[in-house]
């Protein structure tokens, strides 16, 4: 019975880790790369972190480019942050975990128009409202503010011209 429970726990652990992985599009992969670079530039971060799972990935096409929203988890490795791209960096078993929200706006050539990456330590929880407002600002990066039309906008303009 003991072996059955251990086997079940190991299997559930594997399904939990690998069963929820999302297949990312090329744009989403680029957004994740930008987010990881931005995270490792942050001065308080001293250790390298590796992505251990993507919970949610969305992208929307706008006139100025593509907006990518990613929710993913990171875990601390045994390497310093300058070596974060090193494939030999191993995840620390009791390393700190972070849950990240990244909002990236890329132009059609892949240039970054705007970015917001927030990765609190997992036990801190997310400050959802603040992050959402920051994410909404990134959504509009590079867009022409005059390209948004409001109901009745042209009806009033025409009525004024004919007088």
Swiss-Prot record:
Its main location: secreted. Residues 158-163 form a propeptide. SUPFAM superfamilies: Cystatin/monellin. Secreted in an inactive precursor form, prochemerin, which is proteolytically processed by a variety of extracellular proteases to generate forms with differing levels of bioactivity. For example, the removal of six amino acids results in chemerin-157, which exhibits the highest activity, while removal of seven amino acids results in chemerin-156 which has slightly less activity. Some proteases are able to cleave at more than one site and chemerin forms may be sequentially processed by different enzymes to modulate activity levels. It comes from the Eukaryota. One of its GO terms (biological process) is inflammatory response. It is found in: Secreted. GO terms for molecular function: signaling receptor binding. Residues 1-20 form the signal peptide. Keywords: Chemotaxis, Differentiation, Disulfide bond, Inflammatory response, Secreted, Signal. The keyword Cell membrane does not apply. InterPro entries: Chemerin, Cystatin_sf. Disulfide bonds join 79-89, 100-119, 103-135. One of its GO terms (cellular component) is extracellular space. PANTHER family: RETINOIC ACID RECEPTOR RESPONDER PROTEIN 2. Adipocyte-secreted protein (adipokine) that regulates adipogenesis, metabolism and inflammation through activation of the chemokine-like receptor 1 (CMKLR1). Also acts as a ligand for CMKLR2. Can also bind to C-C chemokine receptor-like 2 (CCRL2), but with a lower affinity than it does to CMKLR1 or CMKLR2. Positively regulates adipocyte differentiation, modulates the expression of adipocyte genes involved in lipid and glucose metabolism and might play a role in angiogenesis, a process essential for the expansion of white adipose tissue. This is Retinoic acid receptor responder protein 2. It comes from Cricetulus griseus. The gene is RARRES2.
């Amino acid at each position: 019975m003991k072996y059955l429970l251990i086997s079940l726990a190991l299997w559930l652990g594997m399904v939990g880790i690998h069963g929820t992985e999302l297949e990312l599009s090329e744009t989403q992969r680029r957004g994740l790369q930008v987010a990881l670079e931005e995270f490792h530039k942050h001065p308080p971060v001293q250790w390298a972190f590796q992505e251990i799972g993507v919970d949610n990935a969305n992208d929307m096409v706008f006139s100025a480019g593509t907006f990518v929203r990613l929710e993913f988890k990171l875990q601390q490795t045994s390497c310093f942050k300058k070596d974060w791209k090193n494939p030999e960096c191993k995840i620390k078993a009791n390393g700190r975990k972070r849950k990240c929200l990244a909002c990236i706006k890329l132009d059609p050539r892949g240039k970054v128009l705007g970015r917001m990456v927030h990765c609190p330590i997992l036990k801190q929880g997310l400050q959802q409202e603040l992050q959402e407002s920051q994410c909404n600002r990134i959504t509009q990066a590079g867009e022409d503010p005059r390209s948004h039309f409001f109901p009745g906008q042209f009806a009033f303009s025409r009525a004024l011209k004919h007088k």
